[in-house]
């Protein structure tokens, strides 16, 4: 060392030392891993070489412990700590995953305040100094007054070796004349406190206002089961309890013995040099263990013979442990406390459960979080071990192991980190519940690079298209799959009007037994699905055929789930998610009982190729869109024969529904090149052929077939890109006001297009690939694909909206919600609730503009009254209608605002 170290014996010298220490740490924090590892090796080697003189000094100064055992402690602190962490990265990049864009960088915490106990003054100092050096931290030691010289000597050995190996001078410091005032100052000025010692000191560390890593009180119980190897158990406990005269905090304080082996255990203890106190002697030792309710410092680390002398009890000089046979596990029993000496309480247990109860009480009274121990046949008694592990509130549960050696780690086990600071978790008032190591003394910076989600395109295994394809597609049920029982789900109209006959005729031809549920109503309810699944369970089909529009197919999907998994909870299935792959609820695997075929009879819903189903809770009227790829049909049969006689109203509503499917899929934050192509082509076909299908009906086969294909393509697009807030609002509009789903979408789509097209939205959608608001440009692309013209994106949007409105008009869709006869007062009365439910709809998450509830409410109002532009005209404020919140006055306020008489 170039500079002679200055003695720290006052607050002034301490403050000066702390300033120098911080400078040293700042320099040390720039060292490379190679430099640090060189210093770490040199310091550990020096400490190991000084193990004997340091042990002698500790015993001489404190008058506690056994020199030979302290040699082992010092050796352990140097050798085992070095071995455990010699290859551990603690500088710079310690972990990197380039594929996921994650990098972890280790930084030192700064200055460590280390509180050192009198029980292990040199080994703990070595341990903490080595951890500090490995993690590029500076450390200042506050020794116990009874062990200040030996603690300082240990620190100096490590410091000198570290500086010689290249560490900054003064990187390790210690208080030469410790006092409470200086210890408190150290804890106040440090960046982290590493506290090992009595409960008072540890509590002070945690109360200092600085991060602290500490220990808790130990009161280790050791249970000996009647299946235990008695020789192993007894000698392990003796070995542990006598190690350094019992001053390891994990050492056994009580032994609880099954009554079946109690005498044998007692005999073995006695044979190995332990002394059983008689009742009179037990009482004398009781009075020696505690003085005024606290542990008698005079017995700590003393030999059994010396403690017996203090108690006025005569025992052989070589006695290893004083054992008191006691019954109470309460705090009133002195033997039930932590003793830090070769004094042991011994209890008789009626059975293993009684032993567990006694151990629980001993831990609760003085050793929460620390250590517990059990001896048993771990091969045959795993149930006992499991119960012991479950019941003991300790962070170290040792099996067939001397707890002093086992608790500190890596001696009698090889995955418990070596340490002389044993965390006790929240049970022991600690922040750490494991053996303290280098990871607790570094700050880890995580560098997370932006990554876009893996995307996908998923569709039914088989999609059959073309007029008249039904019988050919169904052939597979017999010829390829060997199916025998088919259950058809449809609505009452289709059933009564013979739509199921082509299916049943083909099934009869193939010899496949069939049954039909024909009671699906529009907006199917959970009650309807449960009624259908009851019949399904009785019939036990291996094939389910859904025939109809969205209602029939959605109801059939729900029945399919309830049939295969009756334990499934509907509310769990309806739980919202942000990412379908990370959802809280995992959908059960489908298709194990029945193969699912979907056959649409209208061109719009797309349910035949989607993982979605909408079901209504009949008790609340709320529609729940369910989403999971387990709901994807196995086969879709798009046969135009089923579409030919669709009435005009259905043709119009379902056709505009398909328009909104394609538009929302194209604008979705999850849109891909695959879904874009399907969406744009679907829109082009619909604009060309929906008017013909509407006007010509069953005489225009081409128009019907084109519409059938367009609806299915739009379905494939939104099956993968998902939908948006238009559908969220339409779901609730239909639920509250019983508008057909396609009509509800038609009424909201203009508002949503304008809403999404904002270049500076209040909030944009959350998805990695959606990096900035660009929906206006997306809508312009749609306009271009439809050949609508426009000089810029805004003009193109207006042309797109105009074309959609003209299309709606051609197929008989009215302009406003009000035009459909929805009562104004009821609409306004339900508006807030409807708004919140729309916001919470599963479809909202993929919308490119994340909507505020106030914005959803505004769109509903605009769609009700026919307001054309979302931002153009102000809505009435709360103050405008504060005097009277009736629907009438709300309406008047709205009109005043529109007329510019009452500017909001």
Segment roles from a protein language model:
Residues 89, 154, 527-641:
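Glycine/threonine-rich beta-strand-loop-alpha-helix active-site module
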Residues 455-543, 817-818:
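ATP/NTP phosphate-donor binding region
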